[in-house]
Amino acid sequence: MKTNPIKLEKKLKLKFSDQKIFIKSLTHKSFDSINNNEKIEFLGDRVLGLIIAKKLLELYPDEKEGVLDKKFASLVNKKKCLEIAKKIELEKYILVLNPKNKKIEIEDKIVADCLEALIGAIYLDKGLNFTERFILNLWSEHITASVITQIDAKTKLQEYSLKIFKVLPIYKLISNTGPRHKPLFKVAVKLKNTKFFTAEGTSKKDAEQNAASLCLQDIFKK
């Protein structure tokens, strides 16, 4: 059994005027093939992007576009959405098909997508200003902690590999899935003496950065 959605409203200090759109934002297509959260997720993804982009411009008015773009990608990707969704325990409230009524573990992508759907529902019910406050409240510590060292992971890994092994890192595209408007890339990277490190991203470039970051973490923890 799922936890009552009203508890989620109380936890997040929300009060939806339209309860139907709130429940819809928590409904996966496996539970209801018609009234599910796919389209609201599409909207929520755009609203999240708008708010984060606006905040980054306010914080870094003189920063180069390329750096802003990478900061942006690190704040709106699936990994970050999942991290925030887990923090508010969103997975407890998602409606998914469970024919045997057993305790199941919901896929990470479904949880991350549901957070975007919830954002879309808040926007439709409360408007942009309220949604902006909601997003910035959840993302504030992540925005201030967005560090350039992680953004430049691919460059750092390349420099390390050339210095130590005299060859470039090897990147391999594992998969490209998801709908056209919301692709999900999986990329693996390895150095001459390492295993492959795999990560995902909303673009191939983003996935490569995330994989490079994992590889660097492994190198420097030794």
Curated annotation (Swiss-Prot):
Signal peptide residue numbers: none
Keywords: Cytoplasm, Endonuclease, Hydrolase, Magnesium, Metal-binding, mRNA processing, Nuclease, RNA-binding, rRNA processing, rRNA-binding, tRNA processing
Cofactors demanded by this protein: Mg(2+)
Record: active site: 45, 116
Coiled-coil segments on the chain, per record: none
A UniProt-annotated Pfam family: Ribonucleas_3_3
Catalyzed chemical reaction(s): Endonucleolytic cleavage to 5'-phosphomonoester
Locations listed in the record: Cytoplasm
E.C. code: 3.1.26.3
One BP annotation, GO: tRNA processing
UniProt-listed CDD domains: DSRM_RNAse_III_family, RIBOc
Positions of Mg(2+) binding: 41, 113, 116
Residue span, RNase III domain: 5-127
SUPFAM superfamilies according to UniProt: dsRNA-binding domain-like (SSF54768), RNase III domain-like (SSF69065)
Domain DRBM: 152-221
CC per GO annotation: cytoplasm
Sample GO molecular function, one term: metal ion binding
Subunit structure: Homodimer.
Reported function: Digests double-stranded RNA. Involved in the processing of primary rRNA transcript to yield the immediate precursors to the large and small rRNAs (23S and 16S). Processes some mRNAs, and tRNAs when they are encoded in the rRNA operon. Processes pre-crRNA and tracrRNA of type II CRISPR loci if present in the organism.
Family that this chain belongs to: Belongs to the ribonuclease III family.
The name this protein goes by in its record: Ribonuclease 3
Native source organism of the sequence: Pelagibacter ubique (strain HTCC1062)
